[in-house]
Structure formats: C-alpha cells, structure tokens
C-alpha cells in the first residue's frame, strides 16, 4: 500500500518502484518505527484525535506486530512495501482496520524517519561504546602484561629509540579513549527528538513535544521543525567518529602486521585470527588485521558519500536523503566487527621478547643517549648531534654498535668522553632516562596503567 496514492491517476512504473523503494535497506528501522508509532499514538490521544480505547487498541496491535516480526523477520521483505513506514502502517490496518488509518494524523514520514534514525543511532551507538570499552580493556591488559618488553620505536619506519611494548599499547589506549569521548559527545548531540515536526512546518496539533521526547527516552525535543526534518548531522557525525576510530584501528593493524612479519618477528598471532595459503604450506597470514585495514576504506567512502549527498540540499526534506541509511548501516556494521576482531587479536597476541630486544639493540637506537652524554659534559646539543653523527658513520663502516668502540676511539671524536659513557649507552639507561610524564620509563608506564585502571 502506497501512502501517497490519491494525487496520482496513472500506474507507477515497475522500474520506478524498484528504484524508489527503500525497504531492502530501511527494514532495519522496524523496531524503532514501531516504538515511535506507539509514542505517537499516545501523543494524538492526548490531544483528542483518538480515544483512550482506540489508543490502547493501536498500541496492542503495534506490540503484537513487534512480536510477530521478531519471530519471523522475513515478513517485512516479503511484503513488497515501499518502505518500513508503509509496512508498519499496512500491517496495522490489517489488524485493526480503519482505526489504523488514524495513526498517521499530524505526522509525516519526514519527522517519522528522522526519529527512527535517531533512535537507531542511539541504540547502536550505545553498543559501539561498549565495544570500544572492551577493546580499551583488552589493550590495557596487554600493556600490563608486556609493560617491560623492550622493542624499537620507529620514525619513518626506521629504528629510532627503544621503547617498551607496554608504551606502544598505551599509545593506542589514548587514541581509543578519544574515540570513546568522541562517540559519547556525538550521541549527546543526537539525543533530541524530531517527532512532532511534521513534514517541515510542525504538526498542526498542539501536543506536548517534551512529553513525546521523554516517552522515547530522548533528552529533549528538537527546536526547529525545518532543521528537524532536514538534519542528518547525527549520521555525518557517527560516520566521522567511526572513520577516525577506524583510522586508529587501521594504524594499529599496520603496526601489528609489521611486528608479526618475518622481517621483525616481534610478536606472534594466535591461530584464531590467522589463515594459511592455498599453495604455500608455511604461511600464516594476518588476515584479521589486513581486513581491518581494508575495511577502513569503505567506512571512509560512506562518510564522503553522506557529506556529498547533503552538501547542496535545499531545506527541507529531499529524496536524496533516502541515501543516508545504506552507508550508515555499513559503517556501523564494519566498525562493530572490526572492534570485536581487534579485541580478539589482542587477546591471543604473544610478544617475542628476545627478538624485540635484539632489534632495539641494533640500528644505533642509543645515539641520542650519546648526544645527551656529551651535553652533560658541556657540549652544545647541536654540536653533540653532529659529533654523534660522525660516530655513527664510523660504527657503520666497522659494522659495530656504538658501545663496542674503545674509549680511545671515542675520544678521537670528542676528547671530553670518559669511561662513564658506557653505562649511558645500555638499553636500560635509554629507557630509564625517559622518566617523565608520558615517557617510556618503566615507572611511568606502570603509573599510567594504574591510573587508567583506577578510572
């Protein structure tokens, strides 16, 4: 049953129906549409459009429909309805007859779908927050377990300075905490109820929209009917928040893919999250991490899609906005499974401490310590930086680490170098000197973990 047939005399093209119908996508809003309709029944009863008995009958029929569809979800798509609103209204009329035709009084599909979508975002957003918290907890547990495992830190993907695996974990803990905060903020801004805004100018019936918002567990009603039905900021913001979080997931995945490679071999991944090759028997591929990295692109694509759809739309509602859901649903699905998969990867991850330590001891990662040593002896840092660069060139030529130079050899570069230089060049010294808030010294890492666990 079309909800708009009276104006038209000709038949709708089958091709147009296929092109126009959104039920294959918006069927996911079924529960929200029923919940919103129940609240709307109470609202129109409060202004005398329907009687208390009629309101009760409508609400019972809607609740019965909810039970029926939850028992057999295929009912929706088999209906051939134009959209989820048409399906619910047609099913309601089939149950209660002409009474069902009264429910849409004062309501438009414009404020109806805006409400459904915000309800869906609130529900799915809460589930995503729970997933982010689970990933955060898993990463924090890994940081605590491997807080003192030494590994090289990188800039430009070249060994730079030694850090610990716990320090690396805490870097991503910080990122996911920002993701949690960002999502919570987005959900707060989306916590307003458009219902009662009508098609664009507001409903003609003087109902209490504050009560209507409260009935649907929104913090407040929206304040401008034009904005209410035109706004998809909450969709954009959820896609944007997901994109930033997926960027963090993708970067973490890339780090772990490298750490797991034969060239690094700092970590091993569990069999649960890896697969093999159809040809090469020795392969153990980090497919879970590669898919996280790959799915990031499709999330970005959906963000660009909704921004492009909305960028030139005049107020108020336009059919273009029907395209808001498919990308959003895919974003939420992709983000959710990537969060779950990342947590599973971390839960089975093992650090290969000897290999990671050996890599940290190579590549002249203690060069900065030698420069700092020269500074402690009175040499300006820029001069010390140049001197140590010359030492590194000589060490590369001799294929030895800095600490294997004799004192006499080191003095040819700077006469102020004494025997006390050698304790400064150990990995332990490199780490211990970074005993500042946010640094990689072991006490700082332990304090950071304890502070985050105490929250």
Swiss-Prot record:
Catalysed reactions, as listed in the record = 2-(N(omega)-L-arginino)succinate = fumarate + L-arginine
Molecular functions per Gene Ontology: argininosuccinate lyase activity
EC numbers for this chain: 4.3.2.1
Q: What is this protein called?
A: Argininosuccinate lyase
| This protein's GO CC annotations | cytosol
UniProtKB keywords = Amino-acid biosynthesis, Arginine biosynthesis, Cytoplasm, Lyase
Q: Which gene encodes it?
A: argH
Q: Which PROSITE patterns match?
A: FUMARATE_LYASES
The record ties this protein, via Gene3D superfamilies, to: Fumarase/aspartase (C-terminal domain) (1.10.40.30), Fumarase/aspartase (Central domain) (1.20.200.10), Fumarase/aspartase (N-terminal domain) (1.10.275.10)
Associated pathway: Amino-acid biosynthesis; L-arginine biosynthesis; L-arginine from L-ornithine and carbamoyl phosphate: step 3/3
Cysteines joined through disulfide linkages: none
Q: What is its main location?
A: cytoplasm
Location in or out of the cell: Cytoplasm
Q: What is the native source organism of this protein?
A: Shewanella baltica (strain OS195)
Q: Does the keyword Iron-sulfur apply?
A: no
């Amino acid at each position: 049953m079309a909800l708009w047939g009276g104006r038209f005399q000709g038949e709708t093209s089958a091709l147009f129906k296929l092109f126009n119908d959104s039920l294959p996508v918006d069927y996911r809003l079924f529960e929200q549409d029923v919940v919103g309709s129940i609240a709307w029944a109470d609202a129109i009863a409060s202004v005398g459009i329907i009687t208390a008995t009629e309101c009760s009958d409508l609400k019972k029929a809607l609740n019965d429909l909810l039970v029926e569809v939850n028992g057999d979800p295929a009912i929706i798509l088999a209906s051939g309805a134009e959209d989820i609103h048409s399906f619910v209204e047609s099913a309601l009329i089939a149950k209660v007859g002409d009474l069902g035709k009264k429910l849409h009084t004062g309501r438009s599909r414009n404020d109806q779908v805006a409400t459904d979508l915000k309800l869906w975002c609130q529900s799915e957003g809460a589930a995503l927050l729970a997933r982010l918290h689970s990933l955060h907890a898993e990463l924090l547990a890994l940081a605590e377990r491997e807080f003192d495992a030494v590994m090289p830190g990188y800039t430009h993907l070249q060994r730079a300075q030694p850090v610990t695996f716990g320090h690396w974990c805490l870097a991503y803990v910080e990122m996911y905490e920002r993701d949690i905060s960002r999502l919570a903020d987005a959900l707060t801004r989306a916590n307003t109820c458009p219902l009662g805004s009508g098609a664009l100018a507001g409903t003609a019936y003087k109902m209490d929209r504050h009560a209507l918002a409260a009935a649907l567990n929104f913090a407040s009603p929206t304040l401008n009917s034009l904005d209410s039905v035109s706004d998809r900021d909450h969709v954009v913001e959820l896609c944007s928040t997901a994109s930033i979080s997926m960027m963090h997931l993708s970067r973490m995945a890339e780090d772990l893919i490298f750490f797991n490679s034969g060239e690094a071999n700092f970590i091993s991944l569990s069999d649960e999250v890896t697969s093999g090759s159809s040809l090469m028997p020795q392969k153990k591929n980090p497919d879970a991490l590669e898919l996280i990295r790959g799915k990031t692109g499709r999330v970005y694509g959906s963000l660009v899609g909704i921004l492009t759809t909305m960028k030139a739309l005049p107020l108020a509602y336009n059919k273009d906005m029907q395209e808001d859901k498919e990308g959003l649903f895919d974003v939420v699905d992709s983000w959710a499974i990537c969060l779950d998969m990342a947590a599973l990867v971390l839960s089975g991850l093992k650090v290969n401490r000897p290999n990671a330590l050996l890599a940290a001891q190579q590549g002249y990662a203690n060069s900065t310590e030698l420069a700092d040593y020269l500074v402690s002896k009175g040499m300006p840092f820029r001069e010390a930086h140049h001197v140590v660069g010359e030492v590194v060139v000589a060490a590369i030529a001799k294929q030895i680490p800095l600490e294997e130079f004799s004192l006499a050899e080191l003095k040819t570069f700077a006469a102020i170098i004494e025997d006390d230089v050698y304790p400064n060049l150990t990995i332990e010294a490199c780490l211990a000197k970074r005993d500042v808030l946010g640094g990689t010294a072991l006490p700082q890492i332990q304090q950071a973990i304890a502070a985050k666990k105490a929250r």
